[in-house]
Amino acid sequence: IENPNDADVADLTRRHMIHPLAQQEILITTYRPKLEDYDDHLYLVLHFPVVDAKTGAISSREIDFVVFPYNLITVHYQEIPQLDEFQQLLGEHEALRERTFGASSGQLLYHIIRQLFAVSKKELETIEKKVQSAQDRVFEGHERETLQDISHLRRDLLNFQKALKPQH
């Protein structure tokens, strides 16, 4: 579910019997990873770095997962292109869909997280290439022109780290 309002979350809670504490957590921003074990479901919060297609800036995006034995609910309040792409990929490839859904929602959760981290790894590799390019330009005598690029790279690396590192 993308960008639900209070009524959407209340309806979701009623239909799936989500624990009231998990319902409250879904409605607020959680700044660190979280895992709660309720009687018949898990509540999990993870953050992933997302590259803004327009600006190229990296920011952290939260995804809330409610995991039942045979049902998985994802909730997020900002666009997460990697999640949309994964859903589209599953829709287009029946064999992949069957393998991904498997015998339980845990298997689907595994594949979603794996895909999100795979995309994050590619984004990190892109940043590494930009860092190498900036270093090369500095050693070629283009220090002034490279200063702004380095500033943007530093911001991106800090945001990337913030998205993946548990905060204390």
Model-derived features with residue positions:
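Peripheral, non-transmembrane regulatory/ligand-interaction domains of membrane transport proteins
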Residues: 1-168
